[in-house]
Amino acid sequence: MTRPIRATLDLAAIRHNYQQAKACSPESFAFAVIKADAYGHGYEQVAAALAVWPTVLPSSTSSRARTLREAGLRQPILLLEGCFDRAELEEAARLQLTVPFHAAHQFDWLKQGSLPAPLEVMLKLNTGMNRLGFRPDEAPRAAAWLQARNDIRLAGLMTHFATADGDPGIAAQLSRFDEVNASLGLPSCVANSAALMRHPASRRQYVRPGIMLYGASPFADQSAAELGLRPAMRLEADIIGVQSLQAGDAVGYGATFVADRPMRIGVVACGYADGYPRVAPAGTPCAIGGQPARLVGRVSMDMLTIDLTSLPQAGVGDRVTLWGGDGVSIDDVATAAGTIGYELMCALAPRVPRRVVGA
């Protein structure tokens, strides 16, 4: 018998969420961001699920892009981080990938000779995130250098917002971007999920929804359900033991939770080795049969404990929803643990059995 824990990945929900993204900006060409193994949802199956739309599938590594090409995917693929050396740049050209150019050292690779095939490039502009990208004063020269190459097609100008999900918003960064592009006149790619949903000025020729595709909210003050998004990942595990406590009894490592009254505690077959956050505190929500419950005690490597006192019918073998259904969102758990839904999705461990629905 396999360990009683499972993750259900809903491809129909991802398609629905992609359509929600498209509805925000119907005239834009919508990237579907599948970096980090499609935020833990499996990049090959997500790419296949979205293949009915003419979209761009950003990937962080050329090896994964190669896998998609070998699987027959012919849509444009953008390497979000760009290439890491000349050899990868040559492979990107052979695979017909789109590559961001973000720093001067990448031009040194081009100086080594012509590429084996024409390469589509986007110029990345650093407008204030201070991660990757040319400074605004460097961008015109970089663009001119690329446009002078016979083996390069400069397809657009892109940037990334640091605070699209809150204050101070995108105005300052977008102003820097537009000032540069006023002279370049390139197609623009600036909107992530948060910008796409809240900042109409960011809806340009290209948009790139990421976290919203997987049914989590990019905002702290608005839930995924309020945004019309459906959860694409549901994590569940079974109760494998029950303990009856008296007042004063402690639960788990460090005895961090002490019962203040008689209680029933359920032991659940999920722990931090499965990707559940060890820092999730007592009170973190879960559900049993649609009824709300909460964690007590410290999350262990393979197990966690929940309060069954108000659920006398619950016992061994009952399924616990840890996130993604029954009123418990991944954002609820992330907030309780002091992190974000992105991290929980990406941290789901390989040992957790996956079940794919909605294909």
From Swiss-Prot:
Is the Isomerase keyword given for this protein? yes
Query: Which class of enzymes does this protein belong to?
Result: isomerase
Q: Which SUPFAM superfamilies match?
A: Alanine racemase C-terminal domain-like, PLP-binding barrel
The GO biological-process annotations, alphabetized, read as:
D-alanine biosynthetic process
List the PROSITE patterns hit by this protein, alphabetically: ALANINE_RACEMASE (PS00395)
Gene that this polypeptide is encoded by: alr
UniProt KW keywords: Isomerase, Pyridoxal phosphate
Protein name, entry field? Alanine racemase
NCBIfam families according to UniProt: alr
Q: What is its EC number?
A: 5.1.1.1
- Binding residues annotated for substrate, in chain numbering: R131, M301
Pathway in which this enzyme or protein is active:
Amino-acid biosynthesis; D-alanine biosynthesis; D-alanine from L-alanine: step 1/1
